[in-house]
Amino acid sequence: MKQSLAVKTFEDLFAELGERARTRPAGSATVAALDGGVHGLGKKILEEAGEVWLAAEHESDDALAGEISQLLYWTQVLMIARGLSLDDVYRKL
């Protein structure tokens, strides 16, 4: 029997990142990124977007999914840095 993997939803990730921003655990990469500010986060998002594009062109679906997950992570960190909620974004979909 194949063991199922726990799946983290977009909402779960946002809640987890928000908790890290509030509690500021030592050694957290999320906290360090938030402390680096919006400019650094924007640069990271551009980097990840490029990696998504390259993965779409040249890599497997699994590799592409991994790159997309990183883009979503950094986008959510930027949202938290700017004080946006998921609902702020959902209203624009």
From Swiss-Prot:
The keyword Ion transport does not apply. Pathway: Amino-acid biosynthesis; L-histidine biosynthesis; L-histidine from 5-phospho-alpha-D-ribose 1-diphosphate: step 2/9. InterPro entries: HisE, PRib-ATP_PPHydrolase-like. Its EC number is 3.6.1.31. Keywords: Amino-acid biosynthesis, ATP-binding, Cytoplasm, Histidine biosynthesis, Hydrolase, Nucleotide-binding. One of its GO terms (biological process) is L-histidine biosynthetic process. GO terms for cellular component: cytoplasm. It catalyses: 1-(5-phospho-beta-D-ribosyl)-ATP + H2O = 1-(5-phospho-beta-D-ribosyl)-5'-AMP + diphosphate + H(+). Disulfide bonds: none annotated. It holds the Pfam family PRA-PH. The keyword Transferase does not apply. CDD domains: NTP-PPase_HisE (cd11547). SUPFAM superfamilies: all-alpha NTP pyrophosphatases. Belongs to the PRA-PH family. This is Phosphoribosyl-ATP pyrophosphatase.
